[in-house]
Amino acid sequence: MSSTDAAAARSRAPRILCAGIIVLDEVFRVEEFPKADGKVQANKFFVVNGGCAANAAVAIARLGGGAALAGPMGGPAGEDHNGDQVLRALARENVDCRFCQRVDGLATAKSAIFMNGRGDRTIVTYRDERIAATVPADADIIVAAADAVLADNRYPDFVAPICAAARRRGAPVVLDGDRPTVEDDPLFGLATHVIFSSECLRETTGIADLGDGLRRIARATAAFVAVSNGPDDILYLDGGMLRRLPVFAISAVDTLGAGDAFHGGFALALAEGKDEVEAMRFGSAVAGIKCSRLGGSAGAPNRREVEEFLAENGLPRAAQSNAALQT
């Protein structure tokens, strides 16, 4: 990124290009999950856009960032009703969807999500695997206006060229490690930051201890690496030292899309010039507020709500966040 481009970026809200999976979510809220062959009545039902990239884009837009989305979808318009519904919802959230690629004859992914009164989830997803072979039409054009890229690893053939194009421009690339993969995944080398879910890190490395898992991944990439772990502390490596960042204590109502909200907040904060610890703390606040509300990505907070939350609950605690873990 040239000095002129950098100066222009500072004069406006950062623009984050989110790349990856796009889903239509149908969510059923029940008191208890049905037993085998049983039936239950849902007490709430809603339809919302889903998928890591799409959820993160909504979070970024609500926080005041410029949010663009790139990902393969079914098509064409008028025939793929799942995709049509998702794009209408994203347009209402001010997400730029011009780089969403529709694949004729296929259906956009769809999930049925069952959530009980304790916030536990069961998810069933239909996704036509032929969509995974889609590659971006022109990765350089897609990232031309992006100050940062946030990619999930659900469609590696689609996101890898986008990540590579962003790196050529000098833009940060945040990889959401959501799908278990191999330890030497080429996407790790294309990212400046890799943040895993605990499940993904354990399944990718085969190592139960999250700290040891991060150390294993660090052998394959020079990227900043971290792992979120639900209500427990975020772990990350700092110069090879394993450290922790406490998360906010939240009474969770709905965790759907919380990780995506965290990644969106983290990527936006990085693009705004925050360091990794500050960005993780900001992302943690975004995710925490989202968890306190029912609605999936529709529960993502705005900037004022996050700033008020941080003011009430404290900014990053250097002594605590930079203390080495005893392992």
Name the predicted role of every residue range.
Residues M1-L17, L210-T327:
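Conserved phosphate-binding/catalytic region of the ribokinase-like
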Residues A160-R244, S251:
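Conserved phosphate/ATP/ADP-binding segment of small-molecule kinases
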Residues M1-P76, Q85-R88, N322-T327:
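Glycine-rich phosphate/adenosyl-contacting loop at the front of the ribokinase-like
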Residues A61, R167, A271:
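Gly/Ala-rich phosphate-binding loop of Rossmann-like dinucleotide-binding domains
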Residues L69-P72, R98-V103, I113-A148, N153:
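Conserved phosphate-binding/catalytic loop of the ribokinase/pfkB sugar-kinase fold
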Residues A89-G105:
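A glycine-rich helix N-cap at a beta->alpha junction
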Residues R130-A139, D157, L175-E183:
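Active-site glycine-rich loop that binds ribose-phosphate moieties when present
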